[in-house]
A protein has these predicted regions:
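Catalytic nucleophile-elbow at a beta strand-turn-alpha helix junction centered on a G-D-S/GDSL motif
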Residues: 1-12, 37-42
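Alpha-helical cap/lid subdomain in secreted, periplasmic
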Residues: 14-32, 39-190
Length: 190
């Protein structure tokens, strides 16, 4: 897993990894999470010598990378959508070239995962979910477009999370409208 807080917080609960192992019991799967909360598709905040000793993506040679981007970038609003798409294209090219699979040295398989929706909190100090979700939908659509251009698998978790949030209002799935709690993590994993 590579990307932002949505993926990074999957480390807290383990639902996704458990369901994957349960589904593919006959496979020897290893799931590693290299997501960081502030990561964006074009910005990964690391010290300049972060990979000097050991680059984790290179060390573990992923066959498949699930990419979780779009939420942080969505704060740029509609004006940032084109830049987001271009940065995604660039990132995919860099990952394909820099991190070949261990078994064949071919490019890893990629799965682009859309950003999740925002759950309404009722807190006047936090963004209104309806407004944020319009912005997020644009970035979901942009990620889908990049995936289609590249023939890459795309998973739309935006619609699923938005529907779940609407069905059970009142911060049932997040701690603050955008970071999933355990129930939200389980819902996303399923």
């Amino acid at each position: 897993l590579v990307g932002n807080s949505t993926a990074e917080r999957m480390n807290l609960f383990g639902h996704f990894e458990t369901l994957i192992h349960e589904r593919f019991r006959d496979k020897k799967l290893v799931i590693r999470n290299f997501a960081r909360p502030a990561d964006e598709v074009g910005k990964r905040q690391r010290p300049s010598d972060y990979t000097k000793l050991d680059d984790p993506l290179a060390a573990f040679g992923a066959d498949t990378m699930l990419l979780f981007f779009g939420f942080n970038e969505s704060f740029a609003g509609p004006a940032g959508v084109e830049q987001f798409k271009q940065a995604y294209r660039t990132l995919l090219g860099e990952l394909a070239k820099t991190y070949p699979r261990d078994d064949t040295k071919a490019s890893p398989r990629f799965v682009i995962v859309s950003p999740i929706a925002v759950e309404e909190t009722g807190d006047p100090l936090l963004p209104v979910a309806a407004v944020r979700n319009v912005e997020l939908a644009a970035y979901r659509d942009a990620a889908r477009e990049v995936a289609a251009e590249r023939g890459i698998a795309f998973v739309d978790v935006f619609d699923a999370t938005q529907a779940a949030f609407a069905a059970e209002p009142g911060m049932q799935f997040t701690i603050n409208g955008c970071h999933l709690n355990e129930a939200g993590d389980q819902m996303l994993a399923e």
